[in-house]
Amino acid sequence: MSFQPLDPDFENKIKESFSRQGFMDFIGAEITDIRPGYCEIQVPYKKELSQQHGYFHAGIIGTLADNSGGYAAFTLMPADSSILTVEYKLNLMAPGDGELLISRAQVIKPGRTLTICRPEVLLSRTGFRPCVQLH
């Protein structure tokens, strides 16, 4: 699906907003790809982000899905807008066992006040495999 951003400077708007999220900095997350209707965020594994079995904590997985979806939607919004999450449901399909967590989100239905996105969260250890489904 091809989208036209309402803000020609959407990439800088996203990067500036992301830089104000202290938690993203704290966990070591980086935006690695931004396009109209799409955002990818990665975070490398570190012990401080793990749960009791040494896997990525589900809270970190959900955070990346939430942020990538929000920023995918934000790419299509006017310059003077802001964004907040309304709802998501997280189904964990596999443990967060990997060296790198990657969330790729795509807008599936843009709207004036509500935009629906589909994040896909992947883990990398020896290749990429999905670990979560969002609804």
Locations of regions flagged by a protein language model:
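Non-catalytic linker/capping segments at the edges of enzyme domains
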Residues: 1-42
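HotDog/MaoC-like acyl-thioester-processing domains
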Residues: 3-9, 79, 95-104, 108-135
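Short connector loops at helix/strand junctions that flank enzyme active sites
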Residues: 26, 36-38, 56, 66-68, ...
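Short beta-strand micro-motifs enriched in acidic
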Residues: 32-34, 93, 108
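Short, well-ordered beta-strand segments in beta-rich or mixed alpha/beta enzyme
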Residues: 43-44, 104
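A conserved, well-ordered hydrophobic junction motif at loop->secondary-structure transitions
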Residues: 45-46, 50-64
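Active-site helix/loop of acyl-thioester processing domains in fatty-acid/polyketide metabolism
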Residues: 59-79
